Amino acid sequence: MATRAVARRKSAAGETSGSATSVRANGGELADRDLVGMYLDEIARTPLLDAAKEVELSQTIEAGVFARQVLEGYEETGADATREELQALIDESERAKDVFIRSNLRLVVAVARRYPRSGLPLLDLIQEGNAGLVRAVEKFDYRKGFKFSTYATWWIRQAITRSIADQSRTIRLPVHLVEELGRIRRVQREFNREHGREPEPAEIAAELGSTPERVTDVLDWARDPVSLNMSVDDEGETQFGDLLEDTSAVSPEQSVLTLLRSEELDDLIGRLDPRTASIIKMRYGIDDGRERTLTEVGKEHGLTRERIRQIEKHALLELKKLARDTGFEAAA
């Protein structure tokens, strides 16, 4: 849903990116650090939200979404509220969304800083992460009792890692191939919008007056050869291969750590042994909203990264089993 709040956020992010590009040409990495410092000073002026305020803002946003739906079908629904009243709810919703976003911009910076070797400037990662934050605010369901910071981290990380995966080409194509690739991409987008699926090479070729073999060749040439073992995070734990989409992965709402209401999750984790419970809480930021790396958790418990990974995997399976046995999963 396109909103004025989103537009303002994208506009602000674009201005930051444009300024960064200009200054980088003259000051390089030092200028980037200066811009990040200025940005942090600016966003630090907005206070953080407590859980009650998050719920209040979410309710206001939800009311605005409903009001927009009513307003769009105003003549058919015969709504009791006037157009002016509905528009007032929409405007208030946009203001609430803007406050929600601004109050969590520091979370985006914290996540973006985990990828210093991604090949992208920190400001660019922050800009992509901000888009993920906007998505999180729009999708957040306060009724499930989750901490917003934990929920939003998933969306922020998704936006950033996808940006890393789409980073600048390592192989430069000739201009005529770039133009041909652009035409192919345009047909792909239009076909997908019209038919709801990706076109086959033969369907693209028919539209462009080309051959399926030529379309396949151009798409193959356009692929970037990137090492799957390339490290992209500060601790060296995340490799490029880890960023590739898992088509079998569940959405954040379906995850075992977000499906359950917070009080039920606390109850389930309390059934694990103390060490395992502590590891799960640290890994997923359940107590303070800050997710720890395998290395950090390992140091805290005097265990290796691999051992922490094994304990975490076993614990998640145990939590799923407990959720089924207790009926929490069905109630979520």
Curated annotation (Swiss-Prot):
Database matches in Pfam families: Sigma70_r1_2, Sigma70_r2, Sigma70_r3, Sigma70_r4
DNA-binding region per UniProt: 294-313
Motif (Polymerase core binding) on chain: 124-137
SUPFAM superfamilies in the record: Sigma2 domain of RNA polymerase sigma factors, Sigma3 and sigma4 domains of RNA polymerase sigma factors
GO biological process: DNA-templated transcription initiation
PROSITE patterns the record matches: SIGMA70_1 (PS00715), SIGMA70_2 (PS00716)
Gene Ontology MF terms: DNA binding; sigma factor activity
Alphabetic keyword roster: DNA-binding, Sigma factor, Transcription, Transcription regulation
Comp. bias (Basic residues): 1-11
Subunit structure: Interacts transiently with the RNA polymerase catalytic core.
NCBIfam families linked: sigma70-ECF (TIGR02937)
Function: Sigma factors are initiation factors that promote the attachment of RNA polymerase to specific initiation sites and are then released.
Protein family: Belongs to the sigma-70 factor family.
Protein name stated in the entry: RNA polymerase principal sigma factor HrdD
Gene label: hrdD
